[in-house]
Structure formats: C-alpha cells, structure tokens
C-alpha cells in the first residue's frame, strides 16, 4: 500500500531526475523547479528554504532558478498560440514582465514582424511596446532635472 508520503517522495525523485537529465532544457527544468517550490518538496530533503535547496542541491542561484520558472510560465502561456515559441530562457525573459494576456498579444505581434527569433529582437520589440505604455518621464529623469536646476540656481548665486 502506497502512502501519500511515498507518492510525494516518488514525485520529488522524478522531478529531480528531470532537472539532472534536462539541465539545459529551460522549460523542463523550470517546470520541475516550480512544482518543487510550490509543493514545498524541498522540505522532504530537510531543506528549510527553496533557496538553500537550490544552492546546495543544484549549485544554482535563486535568481537563475526564478528566471527558469518565469520562462516556463511564459512558454506555458504561449503554447496554445502555435508552434513557434521562444527557444531559450533569454528569449522568454522580456515577456515575463507582462501579464498573460499581453504576453500572448505581443508574441503574436512579434511573430507578424517576421524578424529573426533572437533574444535581442524580442527584447527590443517588448521594450518598444513598454516604452509606448510608459510615456511619463522616469523618476530618475525627474530627480535629475530638479537636481540640475537647483545646482544652476546655486551657481548663479555665487559670485567670483
């Protein structure tokens, strides 16, 4: 008789085998890492946190793991659209900044451009779209302009 705990341990063993076998396949690894994180399977191996599990078990940093998980989520969201999908994590990364609907819409628009499927082309396309949405000056630009004006006023008050 198999208990729930046994099934959970078997599932963890399977997920870790996926990570080991497909270390270069961002989709499979991201999917496995997401399930390990969400189901807290790492506790079964006596790890207190997902981050310590990543570091000690896979020599993987938190940010890299989360990029893989985010890329998996993008591919999972885009997969109903068609067969042409981002081929690696770097190509999927710019789309992670968008909500699910915007990801699908922008991906369709990108494919219509006929541009080569590269991380740089996708990043430029998404950045251009985000630039249209964010027409307000950035906080840094506003502070910079205010600072420059204040410095000019102070310099004008100094007489040599």
Predicted regions: what is each one?
Residues 1-28, 136-138, 152:
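Short, charged, low-complexity amphipathic alpha-helix
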Residues 6, 27, 43, 48-51, ...:
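Compositionally biased, low-structure terminal segments
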Residues 20-98:
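Short, Lys/Arg-enriched phosphate-binding patches
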């Amino acid at each position: 008789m198999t208990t729930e705990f046994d099934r959970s341990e078997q599932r963890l063993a399977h997920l870790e085998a996926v990570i080991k076998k497909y270390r270069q396949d961002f989709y499979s690894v991201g999917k496995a890492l997401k399930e390990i994180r969400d189901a807290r399977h790492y506790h079964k191996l006596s790890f207190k946190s997902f981050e310590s599990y990543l570091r000690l078990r896979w020599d993987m940093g938190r940010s890299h793991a989360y990029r893989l998980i985010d890329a998996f989520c993008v591919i999972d969201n885009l997969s109903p659209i068609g067969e042409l999908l981002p081929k690696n994590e770097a190509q999927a990364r710019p789309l992670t900044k968008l909500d699910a609907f915007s990801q699908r819409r922008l991906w369709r628009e990108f494919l219509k451009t006929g541009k080569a499927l590269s991380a740089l082309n996708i990043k430029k396309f998404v950045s251009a779209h985000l630039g249209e949405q964010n027409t307000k000056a950035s906080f840094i630009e506003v502070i910079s302009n205010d600072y420059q004006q204040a410095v000019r006023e102070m310099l004008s008050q100094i007489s040599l």
